Amino acid sequence: MCVSSSPTNTNRTLELPVSIDVVKLAKGEHKTDEFLRVNKFGQVPVLVERDYANDDDDSMRFVLTESSAILKYLSETFSRTVSASKMYAENEHDLKEKAKIWSAMDWYQTTIRSSAAGLSWHAFVAQNMGGALSLELSKHYEGRLKLSLDVLETKWLGDSSPFLNEKPHPSIADLLVVEDIVNLVVLKGSPFRSQLSSLEELLRTRPRIRKWIDAVSRLNRPAWDELHRVLEMAAATAEKKMNSVRGQSSFSSGSRSRAGSRL
C-alpha cells in the first residue's frame, strides 16, 4: 500500500506500515501518463493498494482519492494497531462516535481547507507552479479563513480537552484539520507578507487553537518537526530570493539616480 501527498503526514505521525511516494507537482509529475494511469483525475492525494501477486494488472489495484476518504480507510484498516487504535473511534463498532469525526472532517473541507488553500496558493504557491500571485485574492481568502478560525476556536474546540469535539484523545479529524493551518507558515515567503496576517498573528487571539496545535504536535514530535522543517525551508528560500531581488532593484535604481545627477 502506498500513499502520495497528504495525508502522508498522518501516516508519518502514526508510523503506519504504508510506503509513501513523493509526487513533485512543480515538475508536473501528477500529469504524466504513468500517474494518470493510477489516478485519472491527475491530483493528489491518492492511495494505491496493490495485489503484488498481480502487480502488472491495473485491475488488481485498489485506488482511493480524497484526503478524508483515505484517512477513514487507513483508520479502519489499521484500527487494531497501537498507534491508530483510538484515532478513529475508541469503540470500532460505535457508528455515532465515527459520525462525529466525519462531521468535523466534512466541515473542514468547505471552511478551513478551502480558505487556507486559497490563501496559500494566491500568496505563495502559485509562483512555483507557473501561476500568478494575487494580493486581492489573498486578502479574500484570508478574510474567509479568519471567519473559519473563529468557528473552530469557539465551536469545535473547548476547554475540557484540547481536541476537536472536546474528545479525550485526538482523532484523524485533528490530524487532517491542523495541517492546513500550520502549513500557513509558508506565508513568510510571500511577497505580500507585510500586507497579510502571519500565522503567529492569526493564532495570537485564538488560545484554544494554539493549545490544540501544541497537543497534536506532541503526538510524535520528531515526525512533526521533520515535516514542518521542509515548510520553513521553503518559506526561508523564497524570502531570501525576494530580498535578493529587492537588493538588486535598489542598486539599479540608485545607479540610475547618480548617473542622472552627473548630466
Stretches found by the model and what they are:
Residues 1-136, 251-252, 258-263:
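GST-like domain detector, emphasizing the conserved glutathione-binding G-site
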Residues 41, 158-159, 219:
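Structured helix-beta-strand junction loops
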Residues 82-90, 116-118, 162-166, 194, ...:
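Short, hydrophobic secondary-structure boundary micro-motifs
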Residues 96, 100, 104-211:
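GST-like fold's C-terminal all-alpha helical module
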Residues 168, 174-263:
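Fungal C-terminal region signature
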